[in-house]
Amino acid sequence: MAGLKDVVTREYTINLHKRLHGVSFKKRAPRAVKEIKKFAKLHMGTEDVRLAPELNQAIWKRGVKGVEYRLRLRISRKRNEEEDAKNPLFSYVEPVLVASAKGLQTVVVEEDA
């Protein structure tokens, strides 16, 4: 899998409404965090997924049961610089502020490094 070796950043729209359907009110925000980690793991192919504090605030801003229907996410696959790291790559997930997340496509973001 040569595709997993590169460092890449993409923007996704995740539909949390369908992933949280049927989840009891007091477990919706914690389940949203788990579902975002699962989504990033699936799309980036990394076991190590880290969430930005801003993303956590975006999930929880309307309380435990008022999670947004859709969130726009920027997921970056980066190299792990720690010497004793189990995985060579990790994913970093942060929110993207948009007026409406409806109808947006997945795009590759060019990094200015």
UniProtKB/Swiss-Prot annotation:
InterPro entries: Ribosomal_eL31, Ribosomal_eL31_CS, Ribosomal_eL31_dom_sf. The keyword Cytoplasm applies. It is found in: Cytoplasm. The keyword Transmembrane helix does not apply. Signal peptide: none annotated. Component of the large ribosomal subunit (LSU). Mature yeast ribosomes consist of a small (40S) and a large (60S) subunit. The 40S small subunit contains 1 molecule of ribosomal RNA (18S rRNA) and 33 different proteins (encoded by 57 genes). The large 60S subunit contains 3 rRNA molecules (25S, 5.8S and 5S rRNA) and 46 different proteins (encoded by 81 genes). PANTHER family: 60S RIBOSOMAL PROTEIN L31. Component of the ribosome, a large ribonucleoprotein complex responsible for the synthesis of proteins in the cell. The small ribosomal subunit (SSU) binds messenger RNAs (mRNAs) and translates the encoded message by selecting cognate aminoacyl-transfer RNA (tRNA) molecules. The large subunit (LSU) contains the ribosomal catalytic site termed the peptidyl transferase center (PTC), which catalyzes the formation of peptide bonds, thereby polymerizing the amino acids delivered by tRNAs into a polypeptide chain. This is Large ribosomal subunit protein eL31B. It comes from Saccharomyces cerevisiae (strain ATCC 204508 / S288c).
